[in-house]
Amino acid sequence: MLIKKITKIIGTSILIILFISIYNSVYFDIPKNEIISKHAKGASDFLELADGSKIHFRDEGNKDGKVLLLVHGFNGSLFNYEPLVPYLSDNYRMISLDLPAHGLTGAVESDLYSHKAYQNVIEEVVKILEVDKFYFVGHSMGGMIAWRYALDNMDQLNGLIIIGSAFFG
């Protein structure tokens, strides 16, 4: 009698654990439009690139000020730079973007996610926004992208600001 009761309790416990494990392993995808409507606030906008990709960006601050192009690090987004806006927006035009596969940009049409592909996206964004010269601010992976961009486009840069980044990769 006691053995049947213990077996029943153990069996029920195993079924409950199995159910919870299966439920937690299922990925419930949130529709992209729902995420965008929730998080694309304020100065958020989207640029369409030549290949049809849509890049999430913000263009804020003093439109007549010197331009800061802000690029986030790995697993980051343009929201990483939000705390700087109140301190810099009076004097600078601040352009930030979500790199492909990050933030609200998400997947891109080209399916290219290398550092060179990120650099090409930045070149296209800068061209679309008609920015001639700017200070490139890059954090972590964004710093490496900024450094590589600088090597190929020194004539476009007023300066390079790299935060917590390795220069290899």
Question: Where do the PLM segments sit?
Answer:
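Short hydrophobic segments within beta-strands
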Residues: 23, 70-74, 137
